[in-house]
Amino acid sequence: MNTVKTVRELRAAVARARSEGKRIGFVPTMGNLHSGHAALVAKAAQRVDFVVASIFVNPLQFGAGEDLDKYPRTLAADQEKLLEAGCHLLFAPTVEEMYPDGMAGQTRVSVPQLSEGLCGASRPGHFEGVATVVSKLFNMVQPDLAVFGQKDYQQLAVIRALVHDLNMPIQIIGEPTVRAADGLALSSRNGYLSEEQRAIAPVLYRSLSQIAQAIRNGERDYPKLVAEQQQQLEAAGLRRDYLEIRQAQNLRPATAQDRELVILVAAYLGATRLIDNLHLDLDTPA
């Protein structure tokens, strides 16, 4: 695996791979990688001949008071994990390489509606930052396909819409969330949790699972289900940001008639914000 830090080097390496007839896969990350990221790279490696990953902590998607400065930078360890997972090329640019003219006047990409509500409500500007940097990276790499984790469900929906609306010839693959044995979704931010908090955190997935089971059992009073689980989260010591049941395809509020749902949660455990979701297809057996 080679590591490059400039757009020029990146494009040259991808051009060489294309000249050899290779299909290109892409996995963008912010680094501090775990088994979930490795699964994304492995999925890409199954589908294409040449896998590119990026590591870039994107300032545009962090708001005031968020964890931009303390977000872990672990490049050496990340390189080892990428190599083991089947990555061929790592793009690890600086902020200056990505935004050579600064960020104040940077052209922005916005995906309305899907970016509103849920994480978009509590993190204003976040998805604009995501859509902008992903658009830049897609233009730099020009992959045949890109793989994203389903843990960031709203982000995945935003990126699917971005690719569709801007006519980008890129296949977007959503890879199922990788979980610890106790159900907690793997996340780079789990490292912020104390031992006591880590023991509490799996309640997020338990709440999602209990809602899903109740719906499968015929319960359609969604506000009641949400209220019950909100109480469970608060009793466990979490501060809820949101807990909602939405239509899986468009993230609109779910009705009793909808058959494909996604249950989404975001909550604070101490100062750490955790997110998770559970997809539910009522036409498919559990």
UniProtKB/Swiss-Prot annotation:
<dbReference type="GO" id="GO:0005829">
    <property type="term" value="C:cytosol"/>
</dbReference>
<feature type="binding site">
    <location>
        <position position="178"/>
    </location>
    <ligand>
        <name>ATP</name>
    </ligand>
</feature>
<protein>
    <recommendedName>
        <fullName>Pantothenate synthetase</fullName>
        <ecNumber>6.3.2.1</ecNumber>
    </recommendedName>
</protein>
<feature type="binding site">
    <location>
        <begin position="149"/>
        <end position="152"/>
    </location>
    <ligand>
        <name>ATP</name>
    </ligand>
</feature>
<comment type="subunit">
    <text>Homodimer.</text>
</comment>
<feature type="binding site">
    <location>
        <position position="155"/>
    </location>
    <ligand>
        <name>(R)-pantoate</name>
    </ligand>
</feature>
<feature type="binding site">
    <location>
        <position position="61"/>
    </location>
    <ligand>
        <name>(R)-pantoate</name>
    </ligand>
</feature>
<dbReference type="InterPro" id="IPR003721">
    <property type="entry name" value="Pantoate_ligase"/>
</dbReference>
<keyword id="KW-0067">ATP-binding</keyword>
<feature type="binding site">
    <location>
        <position position="61"/>
    </location>
    <ligand>
        <name>beta-alanine</name>
    </ligand>
</feature>
<comment type="pathway">
    <text>Cofactor biosynthesis; (R)-pantothenate biosynthesis; (R)-pantothenate from (R)-pantoate and beta-alanine: step 1/1.</text>
</comment>
<dbReference type="GO" id="GO:0015940">
    <property type="term" value="P:pantothenate biosynthetic process"/>
</dbReference>
<dbReference type="Pfam" id="PF02569">
    <property type="entry name" value="Pantoate_ligase"/>
</dbReference>
<feature type="active site" description="Proton donor">
    <location>
        <position position="37"/>
    </location>
</feature>
<comment type="function">
    <text>Catalyzes the condensation of pantoate with beta-alanine in an ATP-dependent reaction via a pantoyl-adenylate intermediate.</text>
</comment>
<keyword id="KW-0436">Ligase</keyword>
<comment type="similarity">
    <text>Belongs to the pantothenate synthetase family.</text>
</comment>
<feature type="binding site">
    <location>
        <begin position="30"/>
        <end position="37"/>
    </location>
    <ligand>
        <name>ATP</name>
    </ligand>
</feature>
<keyword id="KW-0566">Pantothenate biosynthesis</keyword>
<keyword id="KW-0963">Cytoplasm</keyword>
<dbReference type="InterPro" id="IPR014729">
    <property type="entry name" value="Rossmann-like_a/b/a_fold"/>
</dbReference>
<feature type="binding site">
    <location>
        <begin position="186"/>
        <end position="189"/>
    </location>
    <ligand>
        <name>ATP</name>
    </ligand>
</feature>
<keyword id="KW-0547">Nucleotide-binding</keyword>
<dbReference type="InterPro" id="IPR042176">
    <property type="entry name" value="Pantoate_ligase_C"/>
</dbReference>
<dbReference type="GO" id="GO:0004592">
    <property type="term" value="F:pantoate-beta-alanine ligase activity"/>
</dbReference>
<dbReference type="GO" id="GO:0005524">
    <property type="term" value="F:ATP binding"/>
</dbReference>
